[in-house]
Amino acid sequence: MKELQLKYGCNPNQKPSRIFMEEGELPIEVLSGRPGYINFLDAFNSWQLVRELKEATGLPAAASFKHVSPAGAAVGLPLDDTLARIYFVDDVQIPLSPIACAYARARGADRMSSYGDFIALSDTCDLATAMLIKREVSDGVIAPDYTEEALQVLREKRKGTYNVIKIDPAYRPAPIERKQVFGITFEQGRNEVRLDDPSLFQNIPTQNKTFPDEARRDLILALITLKYTQSNSVCYVKSGQAIGIGAGQQSRIHCTRLAGNKADIWWLRQHPRVMNLPFVPGIRRADRDNTIDLFIGEDYMDVLAEGEWQKFFTERPEPLTREEKRAWIAQNTGVSLGSDAFFPFGDNVERAHKSGVQYIAQAGGSVRDDHVIDTCDKYGIAMAFTGVRLFHH
C-alpha cells in the first residue's frame, strides 16, 4: 500500500487528505478503526520516541501522546503498590508484563493530559497491556505487533472502531525529510543524534559531578522525550518515567514551571489522604481523575462545596493545606530534569529544586551559564552540559 486516504486533515474542512510514500510501501497496517490525520501524526512521532527509548535503555517503552507531544513516556520497570493504586491498575487480575508496566506508567503520570491519547508501544502488545488500554479513553495505539488475545480485546473497544496500527519495526526513513508551509518546501537532515552517547555526560561544570546509573537512565529518558516534544520543552523524570512534561511554551521558565507543577501533582497523588479519598461507588474513571486534580489544586471547593461533594464522595474530606502540600512535596527527591535547550537564567534551577530535582541535563551555551552553575551548586545539583539542542517543530 503506497497511500491511505483519510477522512480529512487537521480539521473537518481540510479536504482531501491522505498519507503516502513517494517511494516504496507504507510501513504500516491498520488492523482496526480508521485513524485520522492527527492520529497518524501522534502515532509516527510517538513510535520514534519509544523505539529510541528501547534502543537506549534495553527496556520496553511506552508513550502517551496528545496533539503531537507526549503527555507521558516510560520504560517497563515494575510498579510498586503505591504506583499501581494511583494509576488504577491494582485491580488487574493477571500479572503485568514489562510492556504493560511501561504503558501504565506512561498513561498514569499525567492522567488529565492523557485523556483521549494515542499510545505507542516499543514491543508486542500483549493481553495485559490490551486490558489496561481497553479501560481508558484513548484514540488508538501503534505497536510492532499484537498477540491474538490482545488484538481481540482491542477490536472490541469503542464498538469496533478503536484505531490499531501495526508498524514494521525494521522500517527506517530516508536521511532527508521535507514538509511544506504556505506552499514552500522545507528540507533538512533527520535528527539522528544518539542521546545515550556517554559523551553527553562528560562536561559537568557543577561541584557535584556524580550521576548514579538510575539518574543517567532517567536523563536519557528525558532527552529522548524532549526530542519528540514541541518546543520549548522541559521534562522531569523519576524512576524510569516522565512525571512532568512542559511543552510548547515560548518561555523556558514557563516550561519549567508547567512541568514542575505536573510533577508536584504526580507526587501529591501519592499522599495518603489523596489515595484514600472516599469516592462514591461506581464513579467514572474520568470523573475520579478530575476530582483528584481539583482536590489537590487551589480550586478544591469546586468539589468540596456543600451540594457538590456529595456527587463524588461518601463523606466530605478535609482539603490539604498549603503547608501540608509543601511538606509532602519536600519529600520528593532524586528527580532528573532535561531541557531541550540551554537555561538562560538560574530561575529555572530554583523552580526545579522545589520539585526535588537533583540531576540536570541541558545544552549549555548561555551567556549566563555561570549563574546557572552557581544556582546548581547552591543546592548540590549535578548538571551536565550536553552541547545538544533538541528543538522539535
At which residue positions do the language-model features occur?
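Active-site loops and adjacent core secondary-structure elements that bind or stabilize anionic groups
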Residues: 1-199, 215-233
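Gly-rich Lys/Arg/Thr-decorated short loops/hinges at beta-loop-alpha junctions or inter-strand turns
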Residues: 22-34, 109-115, 188-209, 286-309, ...
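Conserved helix-loop functional segments at active or binding sites
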Residues: 52, 228, 265-269, 354
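Flexible, glycine/charged-enriched surface loops at secondary-structure junctions
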Residues: 56-64, 164-167, 231-238, 268-279, ...
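A structural signal for short secondary-structure junctions
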Residues: 56-57, 111-114, 227-229, 329-332, ...
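Active-site-proximal loop/turn and secondary-structure-junction residues that shape catalytic pockets
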Residues: 69, 125, 238-241, 343, ...
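Glycine- and Gly-Pro-enriched alpha-helical subdomains that act as flexible
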Residues: 71-111, 243-342
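C-terminal binding/interaction regions
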Residues: 121-122, 135-165, 170-172, 188-189, ...
